[in-house]
Amino acid sequence: TAFPEIPKTSLQIKYVPEEMQEHLSPAFYMIPAIDYTEENVIYVNQIQMRDDLALFTTLAHEGYPGHLYQTIFFESTNPDPIRSILNFGGYVEGWATYAEMCSYYLMPLSKTQAAILQKNSSVILALYALADMGIHYEGWSRMDTIEFYARYGIKDAKTVDKIYNLILGS
């Protein structure tokens, strides 16, 4: 199989409280306590879930085979305790993004549809990464960011404004 079996674990799906919805990401996995990984929680932000596809790929990123799977599998290898306190952000997000990209091919879609959606998602992530470097490294202004996205056909100022503010906050 693509993903080795993991020990039995439990998962609770909770919803982001209404008061916090506009400030939080589409979903997030709460990493369990280092000494008790049997209880896992994923919070879903309902206002960010446009459709079943978004929900499916988000849960793949946050749950199985994403963050939840990676956490439970890693802990089942009995790692040196120091590995559980160190943060490897690129590795963790890289794995979850890989899992999310794989999830397009697990949906009831044709292989062509899955490939188009997966590649579109990859391009969007690449545009975010380029904008992040432009804003934080090259000092892009809001207008620079709007011009950057316009070159890729994204011309809605409100959308680019949201992206700009999101990147500034990260």
Give names to the regions the model predicted.
Residues 1-170:
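Long, His/Glu/Asp-enriched segments that create or flank divalent metal/ion-associated functional microenvironments
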